[in-house]
Amino acid sequence: MNQIKHIVYTSDLDLRSYLPSFMGESISALDPRSAVYIGTGIAAQNNEIVVVLLKSSNASRSAYSGMTEAYYRNLPIILVTVGRELDYSVELNDVINSHYVVSSFKEIENLSDLVLPAHIELEVPEKVEGTKSSSVFKCLKDSVSADDYLYTSHNLSFDVDGFKCKVVVGGMENCLEGALSNVLGASLAKKRRRYIGVVTEDEFLHDMNALGNINVNDSLVYFVICDQNNETICDYAKSLGFNTSSIAADEITKEDIKKVFDNKKKSLVVVYGE
């Protein structure tokens, strides 16, 4: 197979973890659907292989509309899903021409009978992860007032005791849908001064379109809990008029929270390093 020159990857992945010495073109996208369509555009213009790299999570299902286009346009796209969270043993007939399971990128480069577009599952060692928690809650507890609204999900753990504001724990465990929209919807009732959402990175990516809703207002404050400093999230929110910042989890203070609250503008803060 020809040397890989183009990679599009979702921003929740660290490309260096998989291809530390990659010297070609690499483009970060916020979500799987966008990543694949960016890849189809590059492939169509250059007539060269494009690798689209994303997690094998529920969100990876949205990549298949773009892969269907790649199939019918006969574009040289390789969809690489990291991990085996979903069962892709049975693929749709009009999405890919070949399907492989490998344990390293070197194996992908050495595949000689690869018929494109293709789907490759990249096996990685399973990580045992508990429910995420964040030091941001400790600072919020001392910063919110009775006139605030705080929303989070079952994917984040914290002790609700001691919060002066209204606290809502929404959704179900492992459900990633609608977190941002829930806070937006609550804000439209205009019963509170400030509407705060603390969400995981995956929850943000599943509902990121909510930031562009016409009803977004200055009472909204979102904290996005990430493993790493995902600058793409801040760039996206800033393009939609949000005040943005990023703070390491072990450095966040009550003063940081107060600064965000005091600007009285719609805001998004990435808290990374949990």
Per-range role (PLM):
Residues 55-64:
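Glycine-rich anion/phosphate-binding loops
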Residues 11-13, 84, 122-128, 154-156, ...:
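Glycine-rich beta-alpha junction loops
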Residues 17-21, 38-41, 65-66, 139-140, ...:
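A short acidic, amphipathic alpha-helical/loop segment
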